[in-house]
């Protein structure tokens, strides 16, 4: 089993791992009239490659908590696929976590697969950790989707872009962090307005108990 991890390069990560980061790739993503230059750095540990995407709008101190988070993570989702394709990385599965990665399945299906067959045999899995946080914004808040003449219904909910809903509807499979949570989010009380989309995907919804090895993953 070969596993790579692709993350945004936060300032805190760049400072912490600067001695171990190697510059891997530089490119410019061209989306209609938009050009986004970006760099990718690599850190390897225990046989796993960690790729960090760096570009002006994406790089911040914290993972989220900014007014332009949706725009930042729209770019992150697109640049992740742009990097994978341009570097010739082949994955059987792209595993996305929570709303920040919610547009990866959309871009793969509606943008990248429209212009090439590179991702033809790649499946997507989306894991819901917390359905409360959905990544909701206006189309005009986004750098890429705002350029498109038409936007699929899968992306929209109540006239807003909804990252979480997009991934639930488009991903090949959807998982949650436990069987209990998997059952709970099928009901309106727990689903934060997304229950009908979750129930519609119930044959592709799986509750998988997750956890952390606290002896190995100990920041102390």
Q: Where do the PLM segments sit?
A:
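Catalytic cores of nucleotide-sugar-dependent glycosyltransferases that transfer UDP/GDP/TDP-activated
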Residues: 1-220
């Amino acid at each position: 089993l070969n596993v790579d991890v692709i993350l945004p390069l936060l300032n805190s990560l760049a400072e912490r791992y600067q001695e171990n980061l190697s510059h891997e790739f530089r490119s410019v993503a061209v989306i209609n009239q938009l050009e986004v230059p970006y760099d990718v750095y690599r850190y390897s540990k225990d046989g796993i490659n960690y790729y960090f995407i760096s570009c002006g709008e994406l790089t911040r101190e914290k993972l989220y908590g900014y007014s332009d988070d949706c725009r930042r993570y729209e770019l992150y989702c697109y640049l992740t696929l742009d990097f994978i394709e341009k570097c010739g990385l082949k994955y059987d599965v792209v595993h996305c976590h929570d709303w920040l990665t919610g547009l990866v399945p959309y871009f793969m299906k509606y943008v990248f697969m429209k212009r090439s067959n590179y991702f033809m045999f790649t499946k997507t899995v989306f894991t819901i950790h917390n359905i409360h946080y959905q990544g909701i914004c206006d189309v005009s808040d986004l750098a890429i989707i705002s350029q498109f003449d038409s936007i699929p219904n899968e992306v929209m909910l109540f006239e807003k872009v909804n990252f979480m809903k997009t991934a639930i509807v488009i991903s090949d499979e959807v998982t949650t962090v436990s069987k209990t949570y998997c059952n709970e989010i099928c009901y309106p009380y727990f689903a934060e307005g997304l229950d009908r989309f979750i129930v519609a995907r119930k044959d592709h919804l799986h509750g998988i108990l997750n956890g952390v090895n606290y002896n190995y993953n100990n920041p102390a």
